[in-house]
């Protein structure tokens, strides 16, 4: 899951860009260069601590890199504004590479481990895949990640294999690759069930497109990608759906249900060739995230009805999402043709 890791690692860059590189009222440059940990085992160098002196920066950066490497840290991120331009050559000398740049800053990164880098490439859009692999015994292939937000959800948090699509890579190829990289299971791609659109994500707060795919297992033995995956199992579908992984009627709850129901309706593998059902347009379902404020559009051939019955909290979240959408539409400027 080297590339899958980049989906999570991209959030590191987002955190870097969101972090203020200078503090109001603070002096430009402190006595000691320092950094703060990110959620993926890396370091964000705090620009407010950059020494004014190039010599001091050279000495302190070398010391910190040695310390961080010994501590098992991964990517080290450094953002330089124009006033820090004199430090650029020193950063190069210590092995930093430019990740991306704009008019306000240059972002550099250095990968410390001896293993292949999982640092994401700069992007205009992110395209990711999640793969629902369900076998004839109604078991779904799920994983636990070692790093990233999912790893912080607890020991009983399981998810489908996921990851970023490489530049020039088809969705089908990416889905097959991600499952094999994370679990060692070979699969046959069967199609796209839905896709989610999320804005202000990743490196430059770009739009993220996440495609929920369906795949059929061609093997069952699991071989973990130990660098990124803590565990992987074939879990009974009923057990997976019964776990309180996501609030009911939230975006990710809906995608899990969609994958399960698509498998059941397909009736498993059928002999011979056949046409699919009558083509149906993917329609947008605006659903609350559930785990934090906000909502996403989930595009699928099925619609998610408003929560009914005893789902008062889910109904409230759903209504809030619809209200926020309506307010945004009213505030949007009218196009002039």
Task: Give residue spans per PLM region.
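Conserved GNAT acetyl-CoA-binding A-motif
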Residues: 69-81
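N-terminal strand-loop-strand
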Residues: 112, 116-160, 186-187, 191-194
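Unchanged
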Residues: 129, 134-136, 146, 163-305
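Conserved acyl-CoA
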Residues: 64-72, 182
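Terminal signal-anchor or tail-anchor transmembrane helices
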Residues: 1-26, 321, 325-328, 337
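Conserved beta-strand-loop-alpha-helix junction that forms the acyl-donor binding cleft
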Residues: 78-86, 146, 165
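Acidic, metal-coordinating catalytic segment for phosphate/diphosphate chemistry
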Residues: 87-130
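Conserved donor-binding loop and adjoining core beta-sheet/short helix segment
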Residues: 27-63
């Amino acid at each position: 899951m080297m590339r899958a890791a980049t989906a999570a690692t991209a959030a590191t860059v987002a955190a870097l860009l969101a972090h203020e590189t200078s503090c109001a009222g603070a002096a430009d440059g402190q006595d000691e260069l320092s950094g703060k940990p990110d959620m993926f085992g890396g370091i964000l160098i705090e620009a407010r601590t950059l020494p004014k002196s190039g010599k001091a920066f050279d000495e302190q950066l070398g010391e910190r890199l040695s310390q961080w490497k010994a501590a098992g840290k991964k990517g080290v991120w450094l953002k330089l504004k124009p006033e820090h331009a004199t430090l650029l050559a020193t950063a190069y000398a210590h092995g930093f590479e430019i990740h991306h740049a704009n008019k306000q800053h240059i972002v550099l990164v250095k990968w410390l481990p001896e293993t292949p880098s999982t640092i994401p490439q700069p992007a205009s859009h992110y395209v990711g895949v999640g793969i629902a692999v369900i076998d004839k015994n109604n078991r779904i292939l799920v994983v636990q990640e070692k790093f990233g937000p999912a790893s912080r959800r607890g020991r009983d948090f399981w998810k489908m294999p996921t990851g970023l699509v490489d530049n020039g890579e088809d969705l089908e190829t990416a889905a097959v690759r991600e499952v094999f990289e994370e679990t060692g299971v070979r699969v046959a791609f069967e199609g796209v069930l839905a896709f989610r659109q999320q804005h202000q994500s990743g490196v430059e707060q770009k739009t993220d497109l996440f495609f929920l795919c369906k795949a059929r297992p061609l093997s069952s033995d699991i071989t973990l990608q130990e660098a990124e995956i803590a565990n992987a199992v074939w879990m009974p579908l009923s057990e997976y759906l019964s776990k309180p992984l996501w609030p009911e009627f939230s975006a990710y709850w809906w995608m899990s249900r969609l994958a399960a129901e698509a498998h059941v309706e397909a009736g498993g593998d059928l002999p011979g060739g056949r046409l699919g059902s009558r083509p149906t347009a993917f329609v947008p379902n605006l659903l609350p995230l559930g785990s934090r404020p906000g909502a996403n559009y989930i595009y699928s051939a099925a619609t998610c009805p408003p929560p009914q019955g005893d789902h008062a909290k889910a109904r409230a979240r759903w209504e809030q999402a619809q209200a926020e959408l309506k307010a945004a539409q009213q505030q949007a400027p009218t196009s002039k043709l």
